[in-house]
Amino acid sequence: MDFPKEIKRIRQRSFLTQQEFANVIGVAFSTVNRWESGRSEPNLKAMKSINTFCVDNNIPYEVLEEYWFDYKIEK
């Protein structure tokens, strides 16, 4: 699995639309759409919000975090 698929999995596991997920983590709908399509990656602030969301909803976060670190190292 790759980063875009993992973001989408986290969102879908919570039964949220892209708009709802964006509202919860404090970003624009278009931002979530770009993450899920692989056109961009979250910054550190967004990753912290996603982490908080995952912890609050008992969703594993570690895989997403590893993908994000790998992306930052490759960049």
Which role fits each region the language model picked out?
Residues 8, 12, 26, 37-39, ...:
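Residue-level detection of the helix-turn-helix DNA-binding "recognition helix"
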